[in-house]
């Protein structure tokens, strides 16, 4: 099953709807990327909320437009809060997204993520090694993102998408987005995106927010990947290194005009 190239015209249309809706996105993410994730969502036009206490996470997940669960700095108490939020989201039919950070290397988070899959995520976003591990096809590894690695993990992503009935994103130099039947590829970005902490985690938050939009979930999630790739390219052109890249990236998201980018490429 060969992937199709995602259409930037559709990404431009989806971004207009995203900014109009400004989805309230409940981010249960890791401690390292809280601020960057919130700023990424704000720059694109979404409304982030970082609610983590179990007593608050359960009711808040029911009123949010979308939920992100990122296990990067997972603890036992945080796992309890995340499960409570996911159960609430499931009952309320709030779409939720799983980011299974380092799931192949650590047993506690692997078991936790596998257990959560029964509560039907709308989307899963990970690098090649994470998707392979979650699909039960490989364990361990650092999860280095390369075009070859992401493409090699695509069959696992497609199988996982069919098994869970969700969208699976494998990120790398080229991102692959699949529902198990149809697969889209999103090239672009810049190597500087891998030289700062949080671009993948922030993408997961944008993917989660995009799942709140009406229409085809596959196209909405692929559009989210496209926005981040385009912003990364634009920011790299204005940056001298990782330190200047971060503010340039947020500015690029804020000023993102997919139609203009489409016309110049």
Swiss-Prot record:
InterPro entries: Hyethyz_kinase, Ribokinase-like
Transmembrane regions: none
HAMAP family: Thz_kinase (MF_00228)
Homology family: Belongs to the Thz kinase family.
Pathway listed: Cofactor biosynthesis; thiamine diphosphate biosynthesis; 4-methyl-5-(2-phosphoethyl)-thiazole from 5-(2-hydroxyethyl)-4-methylthiazole: step 1/1
Nucleotide-binding recorded as keyword: yes
Annotated catalysed reactions: 5-(2-hydroxyethyl)-4-methylthiazole + ATP = 4-methyl-5-(2-phosphooxyethyl)-thiazole + ADP + H(+)
Protein name: Hydroxyethylthiazole kinase
Binding positions (substrate): 50, 198
Record bears the keyword Transcription regulation: no
Residues that, per the record, bind ATP: 125, 171
Cofactor names: Mg(2+)
UniProt KW keywords: ATP-binding, Kinase, Magnesium, Metal-binding, Nucleotide-binding, Thiamine biosynthesis, Transferase
Short name of one Pfam family: HK
GO molecular function: ATP binding; hydroxyethylthiazole kinase activity; magnesium ion binding
CDD domains: THZ_kinase
Listed GO biological process terms: thiamine biosynthetic process; thiamine diphosphate biosynthetic process
EC number of the protein: 2.7.1.50
Gene3D superfamilies xrefs: 3.40.1190.20
Function: Catalyzes the phosphorylation of the hydroxyl group of 4-methyl-5-beta-hydroxyethylthiazole (THZ).
């Amino acid at each position: 099953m060969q992937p199709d190239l995602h259409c930037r015209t559709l990404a431009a249309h989806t971004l207009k709807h995203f900014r109009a809706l400004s989805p309230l996105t409940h981010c249960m993410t890791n401690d390292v990327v809280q601020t960057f994730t919130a700023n990424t969502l704000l720059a694109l036009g979404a409304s982030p909320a970082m609610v983590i206490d179990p007593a608050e996470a359960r009711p808040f997940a029911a009123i949010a437009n979308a939920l992100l669960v990122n296990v990067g700095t997972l603890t036992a108490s945080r796992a309890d809060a995340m499960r409570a939020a996911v159960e609430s989201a499931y009952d309320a039919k709030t779409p939720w997204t799983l980011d299974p950070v380092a799931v192949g290397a650590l047993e506690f988070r692997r078991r936790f993520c596998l257990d959560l899959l029964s509560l039907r995520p709308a989307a899963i976003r990970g690098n090649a090694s994470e998707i392979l591990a979650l699909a039960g096809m490989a364990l361990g590894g650092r999860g280095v993102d390369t075009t070859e690695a992401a493409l090699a993990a695509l069959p696992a992503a497609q199988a996982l998408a069919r098994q869970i009935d969700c969208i699976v994103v494998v990120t790398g130099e080229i991102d692959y987005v699949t529902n198990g039947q149809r697969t889209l590829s999103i090239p672009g970005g810049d190597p500087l995106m891998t030289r700062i902490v949080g671009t993948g985690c922030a993408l997961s938050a944008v993917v989660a927010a995009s799942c709140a939009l009406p229409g085809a979930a596959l196209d909405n999630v692929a559009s989210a990947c496209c926005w981040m790739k385009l912003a990364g390219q634009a920011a790299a052109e204005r940056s001298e290194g990782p330190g200047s890249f971060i503010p340039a990236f947020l500015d690029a998201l804020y000023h993102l005009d997919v139609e203009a980018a489409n016309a110049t490429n």
